[in-house]
Amino acid sequence: MKKISAKLLSLLFVLVISLAVNSHYKTISEAKKQTLTVSFVDVGQGSATLIQYKGKNVLIDTGEESEYNKLKKFLDSKKVKSISNMIITHNDSDHMGGADLVIKDYKVKMVTRAKYQEKKKNKQITELDSAIRDNRIKTKKVKAGSKIKIASGVQMAVYSPSKKSDESNKNSIVMRLSHGGNSFLFTGDIDANIENALVEKYNLESDVLQVAHHGSGYSSAMLFLSKVSAKYSVISVGEGNPYGHPADFVVKRLGNFSDYIYRTDRNGTVTFTSDGENLDVKTDTVYNDDGNIQKNPGAVSGDNGGGKYIGNVNTKVYHGEHCGNLPIEKNRKYFNSGADAESYGYRAHSACVGR
């Protein structure tokens, strides 16, 4: 009897362990199927970013009211009907000018804003306040230390603002989104002083950085960029804007820390897809060294020629396969290594492989 009981207990133990292991691997497998996308939308001189995960749509900023048609066209192309959370990083019109129009056209369930607001109100703020009130939308105010939920298992940590300022840019919400082993840092329009203050408080290391203030010369401090150490940098900026964004020296500085630099004025909308382990990037266009623009290239890769590095036969510069400045196909030469490219007299592109 004792022998039978011992055997029965052994079988039960094996069964429990087997079920636990199978459940564990099933959970991992299901997690890998849950892809997250982050799209930095081309809205001209402004900023708008769409996060999609588990059927939820989270919109960070909306761009200018005058550029709203670009945002709406993109949202409709993604079959967006409702927005679970519209986050307004700060009150500049190039970040929230279209917010009331988003509420008009889509079912917005929540609006998140910074806890600290400057006293001065512009026309867009008044329109947004009215739209929130008229549609009885829930609101949330966040500051450093707050959390913003995207969906089950994924949230954003808020790093700023930590105190009130009379300057809108300094009140920008700074957030870090984590999805498995991948991370994104959103910076609004913060300046170098706030960037350096964040360095003292947080681990900023991220895979993707939305460059602060459209690449303004008042942001992107060296120390900050070195701590973020982003493989990908994205500049939300409008072509021919009157502010000179992005500053040339900022772009060069980014090249010291990022492998790939994307600009919405040249690359159009930039979309990252994360499975929790890997990141894929897709752009609307590829901006080329020779001034040509290749439309709808799909995912940027070197598959056509089988090489990891892509050279421009006209400039004798070679790029990484995901660079945002690849030449058009007829001007490409493929290489298996940087050394291979250099043996043919090519030099590395400073913003992607020439680090």
Spell out what each predicted region is.
Residues 1, 307-308, 320:
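Accessible peptide chain termini
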Residues 299-316:
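SH3-family beta-barrel domains
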Residues 336-348:
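A short, charged, amphipathic alpha-helix used as a generic interaction element across diverse proteins
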Residues 312-328:
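Short aromatic-glycine-(Arg/Gly/Cys) micro-motifs in beta-strand/loop hairpins
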Residues 2-304, 325, 331, 343, ...:
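Non-globular, low-confidence helical/coil segments that flank catalytic cores
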